Amino acid sequence: AGIKWLCLGIESADQKIRLEISKGKFEDVDITNIVKQVHEADINIIGNYMFGLPGDNMESMQKTLDLSKELKTLAWNAYAAMPLPGSQLYKEAIESGWDLPENYAGYSFHAYNTKPIPTDELTSKQILEFRDQAFLDYHTWPPFLDKVNHHFGQIAVDNIKEMTKIKLKR
């Protein structure tokens, strides 16, 4: 018995962006050291990342992808920042007059018609394109596939390779 998996909301490699989205509710931590300690405890990590957070640009999103590869978690999720109804980001979006989805399907993170918020430097389309490409980059990255093979075997690797052949329609 015991913990075998831990999901971490790593969000962004950019300290300023992380602190801004948490509005000071969380202290900044050395995520690299935390992930190392969790791995040493033989606990697998699901890393969650966000692209298109307020303040994000291509450079900061690339830093987040690079950090995710440095951490090399066994499971990887990436989302485009979405002002979900009821969230603080949604309240900010309403107050700022941002263009929001017209129906709930537009709030779905991976739907074809998802509509994340743009940043000052990036359009929603650019953020989605980056997120989709980052997903492919991570899941076809040989060190990740080697880690999956070590933990789950070649069948799991083959399934991932088949999955990454399917491109999302945009």
List each model region and its residues.
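Short, amphipathic C-terminal "tail helix"
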Residues: 154-170
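A structural motif corresponding to the C-terminal lobe/cap of the Radical SAM core domain
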Residues: 1-155
